[in-house]
């Protein structure tokens, strides 16, 4: 009798476990979420690299249970988007993911990474956009093995969302760093943006060729309004126009690329997320979003707490929700939540084009 009851208990446990897995999967609006980007969304891929661009130390992650490699006090935008999409947990970093975990998605983002190969080299090792795409191609081979054949894998991957956001470092750690790079002497801002978009398009088409069909492309934020940029501004409050103007040239071309890619690939859907506009709204109307400090980092050194970014063991500000910026370059969790929510569910017509992520997920 005891053996009989034991067997039934085991069966019930297995049934409950199976039901919980199905329920967790059913809650997600898409089967998987793949992330490509830089330090704005890196969640640990740089931890094992020989690089200055790392954040696996306190006080990074102070509101996340400890440092993980995220460049914020807490969640990044893609963490919040994963929650909004219904995933039961955050998308794992490529350098830690294993087995069937990849079926929920992978984060390939790398701090200091750019669209151009040389971008960020002065900071050490990083995984460029093309390197991230190669890592994704390895993942696809693993998905094929897990699902049994290429047809099943293709059907699975076409329903996933692919978040791509690069370009900031191609300006911060390339074009506007003439001591290390010659790009600003080789190209006008218009020419440089054309070069970046051409390279960007090549990698997006490579992702398409490996099964990606739902793309959310994030534009560059208001980099000229970061504490690091403002530290060099005469009054410490006026955004640096030459940086923002160059970024907007890129953003306008990226939005046009969305139209081009949608025309070239009718079986796919590409959308543009206006990170610049959302960021400008927070900076221009801080009280509306609960912010009090828009021109300084919560953790950093020097003017605007932005000349040197957050150092190991440094004590950050107390009221982190009152700050737009966590350090010299990166948003706080509070700002990331706003950006993510407006990317997922646009609050104005300019937030996303031609649709937001919630509608993209429904396709």
Swiss-Prot record:
Top-level taxon in the UniProt lineage: Eukaryota
Primary location class: secreted
Similarity comment text for this entry: Belongs to the 'GDSL' lipolytic enzyme family.
EC nos: 3.1.1.-
GO molecular function (one): hydrolase activity, acting on ester bonds
Signal peptide (from-to): 1-24
Catalytic residue list: 39 (nucleophile), 327, 330
Source species: Arabidopsis thaliana (Mouse-ear cress)
Keywords: Hydrolase, Lipid degradation, Lipid metabolism, Secreted, Signal
EC class: hydrolase
Cellular localisation: Secreted
Protein name: GDSL esterase/lipase At1g29670
Chain segments annotated as coiled-coil in the UniProt record: none
GO CC entries: apoplast; chloroplast thylakoid; nucleus
Biological processes annotated in GO: lipid catabolic process
InterPro entries in UniProt: GDSL (IPR001087), GDSL_esterase/lipase (IPR051238), SGNH_hydro_sf (IPR036514), SGNH_plant_lipase-like (IPR035669)
């Amino acid at each position: 009798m005891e053996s009989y009851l034991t067997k039934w208990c085991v069966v019930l446990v297995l049934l409950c476990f199976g039901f919980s897995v199905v329920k967790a999967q059913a809650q997600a609006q898409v089967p998987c979420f793949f992330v490509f980007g830089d330090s704005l969304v890196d969640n640990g891929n740089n931890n094992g690299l020989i690089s200055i661009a790392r954040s696996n130390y306190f006080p990074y992650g102070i509101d996340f249970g400890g440092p993980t490699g995220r460049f914020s006090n807490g969640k990044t935008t893609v963490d919040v988007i994963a929650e909004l999409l219904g995933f039961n947990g955050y998308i794992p970093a490529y350098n830690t993911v294993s087995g069937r975990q990849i079926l929920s998605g992978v984060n390939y983002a790398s701090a200091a990474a750019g669209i151009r190969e040389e971008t960020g080299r002065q900071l050490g090792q990083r995984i460029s956009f093309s390197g991230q795409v190669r890592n994704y191609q390895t993942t696809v081979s693993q998905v094929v093995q897990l699902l049994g054949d290429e047809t099943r894998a293709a059907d699975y991957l076409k329903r996933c969302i692919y978040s791509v956001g690069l370009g900031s470092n191609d300006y911060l750690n390339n074009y506007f760093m003439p001591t290390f790079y010659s790009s600003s002497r080789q190209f006008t801002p218009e020419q440089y943006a054309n070069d970046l978009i051409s390279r960007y398009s090549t990698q997006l088409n490579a992702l398409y060729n490996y099964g990606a069909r739902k793309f959310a492309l994030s534009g560059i934020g208001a980099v000229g309004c970061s504490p690091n940029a403002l530290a060099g501004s005469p009054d410490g409050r006026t955004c640096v126009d030459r940086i923002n103007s160059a970024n907007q040239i890129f953003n306008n071309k990226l939005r046009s690329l969305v139209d081009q890619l949608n025309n070239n690939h009718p079986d796919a859907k590409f959308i543009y997320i206006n990170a610049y506009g959302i960021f400008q709204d927070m900076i221009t109307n801080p009280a509306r979003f609960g912010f009090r400090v828009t021109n300084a980092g919560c953790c950093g050194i020097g003017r605007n707490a932005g000349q040197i970014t957050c150092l190991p063991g440094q004590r950050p500000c107390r009221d982190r929700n009152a700050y737009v910026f966590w350090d010299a370059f990166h948003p706080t969790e509070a700002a990331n939540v706003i950006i993510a929510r407006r990317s997922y569910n646009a609050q104005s017509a300019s937030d996303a084009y031609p649709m937001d992520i919630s509608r993209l997920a429904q396709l």
